[in-house]
Curated annotation (Swiss-Prot):
Top-level class of the enzyme under EC nomenclature: transferase
Top-level taxonomy: Eukaryota, Viridiplantae, Streptophyta, Embryophyta, Tracheophyta
Main location: membrane
Similarity comment: Belongs to the UDP-glycosyltransferase family.
This protein's name: Putative UDP-rhamnose:rhamnosyltransferase 1
Source superkingdom: Eukaryota
Length: 478
C-alpha cells in the first residue's frame, strides 16, 4: 500500500452487533477496541442491560466507542429483564431469539440514520445482510468460534451444499465429515450429537434453525472474520474458505484478553482481593480451578458427581458456582452434597458470585482448569500455560475438546451415549493433569502453547490486517 493511499484513507464508522450472549459480546468488544485504537469511530450495539453489564472501556477509547442501546421487545415466555443467554434456562433461549429478531426495525433505523461504513454481525441476524446491502453498507460476519469447529458444521455455499446430502442421522455427526480432506478426530460423541440435532438443525420457537441463521449471515457478507490464527488452524482456515466459497476468510487472531487494571473491573476488585488471599496460601501449581461458563444448567445427579469428584481428588480447588440470574431450571435448584463444605473446608472453596477468571488463571498456585471447553475459556487458560481437564456439555465444546485432547490436557472419560461420568473418573483425570507424572506431557504442552497464545504482537498483527481490509473495502470509501 502506498503512503499516498494511506494518507487519503478516511476514518471509518464501524458498527458491531453481537448475539445476545456474553461469550459473543466480549470478543466483539475486543474487536471494537482494536478498531477504535486505529482511530475509527465504533458503534457497539446491544440491549440496555447488556450494555450496562459490559466491562469498563479504557478511558483513551471512550471518545471513539459509542454504546448504542436498542430496547429488546417484550416476548411471551421470556422473563422480564432477560436480555442475554445467561439470564434464561437453555430451553428458553429460542424465545430470546424471537426477541432478538424483534430488534430488526431498531437496527434498520439505526443503519439508515447513521449510515456506518461497515456493520460487523454475528450468526443470529439472518435478516441483516439484505438490509445492509439495500442501504449500501458493507457487512462482515465475525465468528467467535474456532475454524475446525466451523468446518465440521459444513458449507453454507449453495454450490457446495448440493454436493453433499444433508446430515439427518445421528451417526453422520459422530465421525469426521466427508468434506474434511485430511486426518481428523474432530466429531461429536453420540450424546453431544443428540443435543446438537435438537438445538441446531430443527426449527425452534423462533421459526428458523440456527443452521439457517448461520447460512444467511455468512452467504450475505462481504468478508468472514473468525477468531483463530494460522499457527494453530492453518489447514482449517484454508478449508473454511473453500467450503464457503468466500474469497476472503480473515483470522482475527485469538484476541487474548489483557488482565484488567483495578479501575477497569467495574468495582469488583474486592472479590479478587479475597480470592487472592486464599490462592496465596496454596501450593504452587496444585490448585484446580473449576468453572463452566454462564449458560450451563446441571442436574442434581451431575452436580453431585462434580462435587464428589473434586473432593475425591484430594487436590485444593476453587470452584466458581454461579447461580443463574433467571431463578429457574436445574442450575438454580441444585444443592451441594450433605457435609461437602465441611469435609473440604480449607482445601476447597466454592465461590457463588462473579469471579475474575483471567486473574485466577494467571495465579501461580493454579495448576489445572476443569472446563466446559468454551473457546474463550481455552484461550484464557492457555495464555497462562494452564493445562485442561475437559468436560464439554453442549454446542461446539466437544469439538474443541477433541481438537486439544492429548495436546494440552485430557477429556474426562464418559459414557458416549449418555454423557455420564463418575466421581472416580473425574478425580483420576484431575490428578492426572495436575500432579501425576504421566500428566507431565500435558503440563509441558500447555506451557509450550502459552508462548503462542500470549503473543500479543502476533495477534495484534492479525487484527491490523482485518482493520486494513475494512479500510480498503468499505462501500463509502472515497
Amino acid at each position: 500500500m502506498s503512503s499516498s493511499s494511506a494518507t487519503k484513507r478516511k476514518k471509518l464508522h464501524i458498527a458491531l452487533f453481537p448475539w445476545l450472549a456474553f461469550g459473543h459480546i466480549i470478543p466483539f468488544l475486543e474487536v471494537a477496541k482494536h478498531i477504535a485504537r486505529k482511530g475509527h469511530k465504533v458503534s457497539f450495539i446491544s440491549t440496555p442491560r447488556n450494555i450496562q453489564r459490559l466491562p469498563k472501556i479504557p478511558e483513551t477509547l471512550t471518545p471513539l466507542i459509542n454504546l448504542v442501546q436498542i430496547p429488546l421487545p417484550h416476548v411471551e415466555n421470556l422473563p422480564e429483564n432477560a436480555e442475554a443467554t445467561m439470564d434464561v434456562p437453555h430451553d428458553v433461549i429460542p424465545y430470546l431469539k424471537i426477541a432478538h429478531d424483534g430488534l430488526e426495525q431498531g437496527i434498520s433505523e439505526f443503519l439508515q440514520a447513521q449510515s456506518p461504513d461497515w456493520i460487523i454481525h454475528d450468526f443470529a441476524p439472518h435478516w441483516l445482510p439484505p438490509i445492509a446491502t439495500k442501504l449500501g453498507i458493507s457487512n462482515a460476519h465475525f465468528s467467535i468460534f474456532n475454524a475446525s469447529s466451523m468446518c465440521f458444521f459444513g458449507s453454507t455455499s449453495p454450490n457446495r451444499v448440493s454436493r453433499y446430502a444433508p446430515r439427518k442421522k445421528l451417526e453422520q455427526f459422530t465421525s469426521p465429515p466427508e468434506w474434511i480432506p485430511f486426518p481428523s478426530k474432530i466429531y461429536h460423541r453420540p450424546f453431544e450429537a443428540k443435543r446438537l440435532m435438537d438445538g441446531t438443525l430443527t426449527p425452534n420457537a423462533s421459526g428458523v434453525t440456527d443452521r439457517f441463521r448461520l447460512e444467511s449471515t455468512i452467504q450475505g457478507c462481504q468478508v468472514y472474520f473468525i477468531r483463530s490464527c494460522r499457527e494453530i488452524e492453518g489447514e482449517w482456515l484454508d478449508l473454511l474458505e473453500d467450503l464457503h466459497e468466500k474469497p476472503i476468510v480473515l483470522p482475527t487472531g485469538l484476541l487474548p484478553p489483557s488482565l484488567p487494571r483495578s479501575d477497569e473491573d467495574g468495582g469488583k476488585d474486592s472479590n479478587w482481593s479475597k480470592i487472592a488471599v486464599w490462592l496465596d496460601k496454596q501450593e504452587k501449581g496444585k490448585v484446580v480451578y473449576a468453572a463452566f461458563g454462564s449458560e450451563l444448567n446441571l442436574s442434581q445427579e451431575v452436580f453431585n458427581e462434580l462435587a464428589l469428584g473434586l473432593e475425591l481428588s484430594g487436590l485444593p480447588f476453587f470452584w466458581v458456582l454461579r447461580k443463574p440470574s433467571h431463578g429457574s431450571g436445574d442450575g438454580d435448584s441444585v444443592k451441594l452434597p450433605d457435609g461437602f463444605e465441611d469435609r473440604v473446608k480449607g482445601r476447597g472453596l466454592v465461590w457463588t458470585t462473579w469471579a475474575p477468571q483471567l486473574k485466577i488463571l494467571s495465579h501461580e498456585s493454579v495448576g489445572g482448569f476443569l472446563t466446559h471447553c468454551g473457546w474463550s475459556s481455552i484461550i484464557e487458560s492457555l495464555q497462562y500455560g494452564c493445562p485442561l481437564i475437559m468436560l464439554p456439555f453442549m454446542y461446539d465444546q466437544g469439538l474443541i475438546a477433541r481438537f486439544w485432547d492429548n495436546k494440552i490436557g485430557a477429556e474426562v472419560p464418559r459414557d458416549e451415549e449418555t454423557g455420564w461420568f463418575t466421581r472416580n473418573e473425574l478425580a483420576n483425570s484431575l490428578k492426572l493433569i495436575v500432579v501425576d507424572e504421566e500428566g507431565k506431557q500435558y503440563r509441558d504442552g500447555a506451557n509450550e502453547y502459552s508462548k503462542l497464545f500470549r503473543d500479543k504482537e502476533l495477534h495484534d498483527r492479525y487484527m491490523d490486517e482485518c482493520v486494513e481490509y475494512l479500510e480498503t473495502h468499505a462501500h463509502h470509501e472515497v
